[in-house]
């Protein structure tokens, strides 16, 4: 029985795939805030000072992002100055969202989209 080229290549290809890393970013730690689709779909509970579902969404995203900034800083992926700048940016976004809800009683879809884009920008800097 003759061994064909296809028969020989299949085991080699399977061995190569098995040895390949599962993630394209195997050398980099992925933080929860790096998954932007998942972050934009977050549903957070309402309670305490949080009175609006969109406000709760922004608050939860901000909390996750600030935790990831702290983790990235501890891992020395961010300098102290960069981590502080990013942390303050997230805190400002969270504070602004809370002010809107206090002022008008809710956070509109447009405002939420704007805050989500701003948080995405911070996340991209943490996840690079």
Locate each region found by the language model:
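Classic N-terminal secretory signal peptides
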Residues: 1-25
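Residue-level detector of functional hotspots within protein domains
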Residues: 8, 48, 64
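N-terminal propeptides/low-complexity segments immediately following signal peptides
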Residues: 24-49
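Short N-terminal helix-initiation segments at or just after the protein's N-terminus
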Residues: 32, 62-64
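Surface-exposed, polar/charged faces of alpha-helical domains
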Residues: 49-56, 60, 67-117, 121-124, ...
């Amino acid at each position: 029985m003759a061994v064909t080229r296809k028969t020989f290549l299949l085991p080699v290809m399977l061995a190569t795939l098995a040895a390949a890393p599962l993630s394209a970013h195997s050398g980099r730690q992925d933080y929860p805030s790096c998954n932007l689709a998942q972050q934009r779909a977050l549903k957070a509970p309402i309670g305490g000072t949080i009175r609006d579902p969109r406000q709760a969404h922004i608050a939860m995203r901000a909390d996750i992002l600030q935790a990831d900034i702290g983790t990235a800083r501890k891992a020395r992926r961010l300098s102290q100055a960069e981590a502080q700048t990013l942390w303050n940016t997230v805190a400002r976004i969270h504070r602004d969202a809370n002010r809107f809800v206090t002022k008008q009683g809710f956070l509109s879809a447009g405002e939420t989209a704007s805050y989500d884009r701003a948080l995405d920008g911070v996340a991209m800097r943490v996840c690079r």
